[in-house]
């Protein structure tokens, strides 16, 4: 029953968000600002394209976790950039231990948001270490990937999930390797 309740809750949230978006568009049209309505529709289209690219990775639990965090960032007017270099994951990363993994990822996003840099960069890729998610508040931290031996490994006791952190000044990056 818990799964059904979660599903219904998600549907209610999506319906609420959709109705809010319609109200914004309708408001622009009422005050005779069709350009504002078009810009808002364009913004929604770009946001949905980003979310769609994440779901193409074919891990719904992982995608839902990222979607929730990204939408929270957008609601708080934080710019989100997403770069995906793989077509899909080889396995479903969040299928096992979803609650633990999503709670940890949520904590990462909240920490980055609290730096007040108003940017979160998400990079999904694969290299010699495996399929990975890089989340940072500074896109330049992407260059630090080649120095992984200097990153701090975080032990969260979740199988098939390695987490590393790098930070200096107010710049923070996390790399999750699956």
What would you call each of these model-derived segments?
Residues 15-31, 92-124, 150-151:
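Conserved ATP-binding N-box helix of the HATPase_c
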Residues 22-63, 86-88, 92:
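Histidine phosphotransfer helical core of two-component systems
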Residues 87, 96, 110, 114-145:
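Conserved beta-strand-loop-beta-strand hairpin that lines the nucleotide-binding pocket
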Residues 144-169:
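ATP phosphate-binding glycine-rich loop and adjacent ATP-lid/helix-beta elements
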Residues 58-76:
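Short beta-to-alpha transition helix within the HATPase_c
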Residues 78-85:
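Conserved transmitter core of two-component histidine kinases
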Residues 171-178:
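Short C-terminal beta-strand
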Residues 1-7:
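Conserved signal-transmission helix
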